[in-house]
Amino acid sequence: MRIFHLITHFSLGGAERVAANIAESQTPGMEYHVVEIMRGRTAYTPKFIGELEKAGVRCHRSWMPDVSFHFLFERIAALLFPLRMLYIMLRWRPDVIHTHTETPDLALYVFSRVFPHMLRRVKIVRTIHNTRLWTGLPRTAQWVEAFFKSRNANIAISDSVRDSYAERFGEVAPIINNGVAEVEQKDYFNISTPQGVHLSQVHQQHLNTSTFSSPVALSLRRAWSYSARC
C-alpha cells in the first residue's frame, strides 16, 4: 500500500511531526511518501528531510516558496498544486492520501475539483489538528469541509478538536489521539546537577529531548477501517 502524506512544508511543526512519525513507522507492506505544498527553508528543513530519508520515506519537495505573511500565499500554492499532484498520481498511483492542516486540505480539495476522477479509487484521510479552522474564510470552509465529509475522511486528535468541529460543521469525527512514546524516567530530585545548573534546567532539557511519536500503525488502521465502514 502506497501512502502519501501532504504537509504544509518540511519544517518544524506539530502536524508535520505527526506526519513524519507516521511515515517513519516502517509498517510492513506500506510505502510512505511525504509531499510539501510550500518549500520549507528553515534551518530545521535539512534535518527533517534527512530524518525521513534515513527511515526510507520518499520526500517530494515543492518549488513554491513558503512566504509567512498572509494566507493568500497558501491559497496561491493550493491553486497551483493540481498540476504537480497530477504528476504524482500518474507516476506513483497512491492508495491513500493523508492531509494535515488547512493548506494541504485546500490543495487536495482544489485538485479534486480540477481532476475529479483521479481520486475515485484513492482513500482520503484527513487529520484535524486544530480547534479553529478557516478563520475569516467561511466560504472556503464550506467548500473544503463538504468535500472531506463526503469522503468520510475526518479524524480528530482530541475531545476538544472533535467537539469544536461538531459544533461548527455538524459532524462528530472519530478521535485518534497523538501518542507519546515510552521513555525511561529518571528521578531528577535525587541526582546531583553540575555547579551553576538549576534542577529545572535539567528537567526542561529532558522534556526537550524526549521522543514524541504517534501510534502510527494503529492510528492508520483505525482511520481507514472506520472510513471504509461509513
Go through each PLM region and give its residues.
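Carbohydrate-associated surface elements
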Residues: 160, 179
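Short His-centered aromatic/hydrophobic patch
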Residues: 81, 99-105, 128
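Proline-aspartate-enriched helix->loop->beta-strand connector
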Residues: 93-95
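N-terminal strand-loop element at the rim of the active site
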Residues: 5-73
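Short hydrophobic signal-anchor/transmembrane segments that target glycosyltransferases
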Residues: 23-29, 111-116, 199, 212, ...
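Conserved donor-binding/catalytic core segment of Leloir-type glycosyltransferases
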Residues: 4, 192-201, 205-222, 228
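A conserved, positively charged/aromatic
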Residues: 73, 77, 89, 118-156, ...
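A short, basic/aromatic alpha-helical/loop segment that forms part
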Residues: 12-13, 134, 182-185, 219-224
